[in-house]
């Protein structure tokens, strides 16, 4: 049986399986927090700027993951270690946590998943992803960057995009009603890759590529 951990709409994060998992783990691990609300536990220090306007801390943490339990648990453990090491929670701790987690996600977790498939292509795919940058781009723009890499890939541009989407490295993105950007990924909503939409490297993966 496959459990669905996806979160189609971030406004529903507090009804999700990820939220329930973390809430239960905190309450069973820390008796002193059993009477505190989830919002109190994840409260941001007043005046702290961590680059996420109008978004609460838990949502920001979830968006750094591939919406898989092991990703979120590892991120929270990393955050806990950094807080214990510094004795406080501030912008520096948040950034250091994000840096270490993203490095683990890309260079350990994802690398172990894609290396057996990509083999000799692996380092060139990493080069290609860095050429793509953090912004949205079309399949045509991706193909142009693909062709600029001095290497003969085993997968065609579209096949490579399908592969990268299915392992959670890229996601589809488009403007919805009112100009709001929408995102769809294999782990978040289980939607298929749409070549007619724009795409982008998932932020957590991009951060890991830059470490």
Question: What residue spans do the PLM features occupy?
Answer:
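C-terminal accessory extensions appended to soluble enzyme cores
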Residues: 118-122, 164, 181
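Short amphipathic alpha-helical interaction segments
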Residues: 150-167, 172
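Winged-helix-like regulatory helical subdomains adjacent to P-loop NTPase cores
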Residues: 54, 63-154
């Amino acid at each position: 049986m496959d459990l669905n951990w996806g979160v189609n709409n971030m406004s529903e994060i507090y009804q999700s399986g990820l939220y329930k998992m973390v809430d239960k783990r905190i309450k069973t691990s820390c008796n002193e927090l059993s009477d505190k609300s989830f919002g109190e536990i994840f409260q941001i220090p007043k005046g702290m700027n961590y680059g996420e306007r109008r978004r609460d801390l838990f949502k920001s943490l979830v968006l750094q993951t591939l919406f898989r339990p092991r990703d979120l648990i590892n991120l929270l453990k990393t955050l806990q270690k950094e807080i214990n090491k510094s004795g406080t929670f501030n912008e520096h701790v948040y950034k250091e946590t994000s840096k270490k987690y993203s490095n683990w996600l890309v260079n350990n977790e994802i690398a172990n998943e894609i290396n057996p498939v990509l083999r000799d292509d692996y380092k060139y795919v990493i080069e290609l992803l860095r050429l793509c940058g953090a912004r949205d781009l079309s399949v045509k723009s991706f193909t142009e960057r693909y062709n600029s890499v001095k290497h003969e890939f085993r997968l065609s541009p579209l096949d490579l995009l399908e592969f990268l989407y299915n392992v959670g490295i890229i996601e589809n993105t488009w403007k919805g009603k009112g100009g709001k950007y929408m995102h769809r990924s294999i782990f978040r909503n289980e939607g298929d890759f749409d070549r007619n939409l724009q795409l982008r490297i998932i932020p957590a993966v991009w951060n890991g590529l830059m470490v």
